[in-house]
Each structure stands twice: as structure tokens, then as C-alpha cells.
């Protein structure tokens, strides 16, 4: 990861997909149609480390799901969900923050993240990312989605910037 240190030190905005990054990309549905997903609590502690080094973060999800909003609220993370064009949201938020794309990190796991992964300075995927997007990544995390990959990323940014 030594070659990533300069990129990690430059991160001024971190953007995360939700399903497959904060979750293991599975969903449980009960007989009433209510959905449940599994999270890693360590990911929330990782976001606190981004707070410590003043790196803002955002969750962007294509799913218009109350579970996404509820988890984002608990994590005190800004969240935009129900989005068809993630890249447009990324462009808007980077412009609002005055952050160049080369100083943005994006963590995503699937083909609907490809445009964002291809646009930023530090494209990152979980260990279990869909094979089609792995070549777009500058960094393939060792942890899978929903099992500490957000924490792994946040810890590395924190270490590079503290």
C-alpha cells in the first residue's frame, strides 16, 4: 500500500456506494416485504476517523430504500439514495466542496459504480467486487463488502493524513 500513500494523503472527499460496500450485497425479505441487511459496526468507527482528519464523506445509492437512509442517519453520514446517475451526484458534490476529481476517493463494488470509479483520483473496490469493475480500481481492499471494507479504507486515509 506504500504506493497508495500519496493518493490517500490527497483525499479531500470520500464517496461510498451502499449495497455491496456497507453491506455484503445480500438482502433478507420477510413475509411482509420488509427488507433487512447486515452491516459491520467497525465501518462506523472508520467514518469517525475520516471526521478526525476533516475528510467529508457521502453515501450514494441507486436504491430508494429506507434501510439506506436509516443506516446513514445512524452513521451521521450524508446520503443521497434513489439515484440513477451517481456520477452526476459526484460531480455536483465535488463542485460544491471545491474538490477536484483527482482528490476524490470512490468506493464501489458493481457495474453501476463504473462511471464514478473511472472518474476519480482514487478508485477503490471491496475484495468481493464484481469482476467487471476490479480493473477500474487503483486499490482492491482486502476486506469484502459488509465486513469491514469501509473501515479498512477509512483507517488508511486516517493513517496517511493524521
PLM feature spans:
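Mg2+-dependent phosphoryl-transfer enzymes with acidic/Ser/Thr/Gly-rich catalytic loops
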Residues: 33-40, 74, 79-80, 87-162
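Non-catalytic pre-domain segments flanking phosphatase-related domains
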Residues: 1-18
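A positional/architectural concept
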Residues: 22-52
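Short, basic/glycine-rich phosphate-binding loops at helix/coil junctions
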Residues: 23-30, 67-75
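Short coil/turn segments at beta-strand junctions that form active-site/ligand-binding loops
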Residues: 10-12, 55, 102-103
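Substrate-recognition element of Asp-dependent hydrolases with the DxDx(T/V) motif
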Residues: 47-71, 80-81, 117
Amino acid at each position: 500500500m506504500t504506493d497508495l500513500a500519496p493518493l490517500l494523503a490527497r483525499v479531500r472527499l470520500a464517496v461510498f456506494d451502499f449495497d455491496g460496500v456497507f453491506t455484503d450485497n445480500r438482502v433478507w425479505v420477510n413475509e411482509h416485504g420488509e427488507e433487512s441487511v447486515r452491516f459491520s459496526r467497525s465501518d462506523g468507527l472508520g467514518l469517525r476517523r475520516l471526521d478526525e482528519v476533516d475528510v467529508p464523506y457521502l453515501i450514494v445509492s441507486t436504491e430508494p430504500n429506507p434501510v439506506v437512509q436509516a443506516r446513514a442517519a445512524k452513521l451521521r453520514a450524508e446520503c443521497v439514495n434513489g439515484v440513477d446517475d451517481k456520477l452526476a451526484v459526484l460531480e455536483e458534490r465535488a463542485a460544491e466542496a471545491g474538490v477536484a476529481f483527482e482528490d476524490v476517493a470512490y468506493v464501489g463494488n458493481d457495474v453501476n459504480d463504473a462511471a464514478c470509479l473511472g472518474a476519480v483520483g482514487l478508485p477503490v473496490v471491496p475484495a468481493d467486487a464484481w469482476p467487471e469493475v476490479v480493473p477500474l480500481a487503483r486499490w482492491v481492499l482486502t476486506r469484502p463488502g459488509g465486513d469491514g471494507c469501509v473501515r479498512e479504507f477509512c483507517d488508511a486515509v486516517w493513517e496517511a493524513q493524521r
